Amino acid sequence: MAGELKVLNALDSAKTQWYHFTAIVIAGMGFFTDAYDLFSISLVTKLLGRIYYFNPASKSPGSLPPNVSAAVNGVAFCGTLAGQLFFGWLGDKMGRKKVYGMTLMLMVICCLASGLSFGSSAKGVMATLCFFRFWLGFGIGGDYPLSATIMSEYANKRTRGAFIAAVFAMQGFGNLTGGIVAIIVSAAFKSRFDAPAYRDDRTGSTVPQADYAWRIVLMFGAIPALLTYYWRMKMPETARYTALVAKNAKQAAADMTQVLNVEIVEEQEKADEVARREQFGLFSRQFLRRHGRHLLGTTVCWFVLDIAFYSSNLFQKDIYTAVQWLPKADTMSALEEMFKISRAQTLVALCGTIPGYWFTVFFIDIIGRFVIQLGGFFFMTAFMLGLAVPYHHWTTPGNHIGFVVMYAFTFFFANFGPNSTTFIVPAEIFPARLRSTCHGISAAAGKAGAIVGSFGFLYAAQSTDASKTDAGYPPGIGVRNSLFFLAGCNVIGFFFTFLVPESKGKSLEELSGENEDDDDVPEAPATADHRTAPAPPA
């Protein structure tokens, strides 16, 4: 049985070794790039509006029209959703390693192409930018199921949660780096090409050279991805895929002996036995009986979490303006506005985002996934209500810092909570031959939530007073009521967490049921399953 395969037992009981940390860095740099690319757009959207939608007759600086802003902010999420489903499925069909390099090269190419977006009109530039950001998102989407699955299948069961969490925690550094790069670029351009505030000189407040600033910020994301490509190609296929899906226990033992200091004996007959028993398909009656409620729990929790998380993260600049933590747009030049938005996001990343990720790394294998996720949803709800109920108090002079502190705590408990655990758990609780697919489905549900948040929040957060809305937007429900809605999403996630099993300290095969006999599964020749081609020797 799978639980008795020596190659898998050796992986579960292996001491933490140098290659584990190497794998964390290789997989983590993908997530560093993912976070940088997905969140860097929020740093430059105000600048894009000033450059391409400038109206000299307007008292306010140019801003992206509602449909354009929604597309620029949300199109990468649409690509990510599609990529999660496609590459998740492909990772179970072709193997984790074969697909892993494809996603990274797609990210590198589209990162560079995003910064080279062109057109004879504003619409042309935005259309080109959206095209490349969709395919950038497609590559990013593949990184979610593949990185999580690869790390879970390499790790030992004692520290598996920390290893997967460490990969995901690189997102925090991606966010931070995005802010730092934007600060450096905007400061450098501002010092070289200084400009007056918009209200003092509407045309001169946006210097022509500012068109290079946003391009540099977007293109920088290609560098860490490119540096990681070689090492991804050197990684061997995971032993769990090779033994349980490709049915080659000998190759699995050989691969793991090369990279981990463990003695492994091949057991082809036991691997064949697992293949004969574990043949039920995705969404079959047996799958739904074993894992249906688990998949429902992971998808719903990730969906509602990302509505709250991404709507808040993408639109930090709007929230900061609403509480007057950022000056009014017409009192700043274009590059000064970019600098101050980037500085604010960097501060939140440094104080709220990164600590939350690493608290998860340190505590997840001590207190478990369930407690962290449940507690995270609870405290996110509490802090969002703490922002929403006395919202008018936070907008009065002298109370803005308190708002930012409370806002940072919501990010802390998102990352020391469901933002991390919703990524980790789907990589642990499903069978090896469906693991990448199920993680992709769960992650795609999350990105559907991100799309709802990124598109919906643009409209919902608009003032209820039509005279105070951004140009082109109808009146919304306001930031205060939007925060109430996001708190409600967290409440839903709290209750659906009870559908997700605790995976701390258990082997992947114990969690997925692959080490259990099941009378409902008919005996069949090992060659009857043609759904996955055996992986060739590395």
Curated annotation (Swiss-Prot):
Q: Which CDD domains match?
A: MFS_PhT
Which organism's genome codes for this protein?
Oryza sativa subsp. japonica (Rice)
* Compartment(s) of residence: Membrane
Membrane association type: Multi-pass membrane protein
Q: Which SUPFAM superfamilies match?
A: MFS general substrate transporter (SSF103473)
* Induction annotation: In roots by phosphate starvation.
Locate the compositionally biased regions of type Acidic residues: 511-522
Report the NCBIfam families cross-referenced here.
Answer: 2A0109
TM region(s), chain numbering: 24-44, 70-90, 99-119, 124-144, 164-184, 211-231, 295-315, 347-367, 370-390, 397-417, 441-461, 482-502
Under the cellular component aspect of Gene Ontology, which terms does the record hold? membrane
* Record-linked PANTHER family: SOLUTE CARRIER FAMILY 22 MEMBER
Q: Which residues lie on this side of the membrane: Extracellular?
A: 45-69, 120-123, 185-210, 316-346, 391-396, 462-481
- Keywords associated with the record: Membrane, Phosphate transport, Symport, Transmembrane, Transmembrane helix, Transport
Among Pfam families, the record links this protein to: Sugar_tr
Q: Name one GO molecular function term.
A: symporter activity
Question: Where is the stretch described as Disordered?
Answer: 507-538
User: Which residues does the entry place in the Cytoplasmic compartment?
Assistant: 1-23, 91-98, 145-163, 232-294, 368-369, 418-440, 503-538
Q: Name one GO biological process term.
A: phosphate ion transport
Additional record remark: Although related to the sugar transporter family, it does not transport sugars.
The job of this chain, per UniProt, is described as: High-affinity transporter for external inorganic phosphate.
Q: Does the keyword Transmembrane helix apply?
A: yes
Protein name as it appears in the record: Probable inorganic phosphate transporter 1-4
**What is the reported tissue distribution?**
Expressed at low levels in roots.
| Similarity section | Belongs to the major facilitator superfamily. Phosphate:H(+) symporter (TC 2.A.1.9) family.
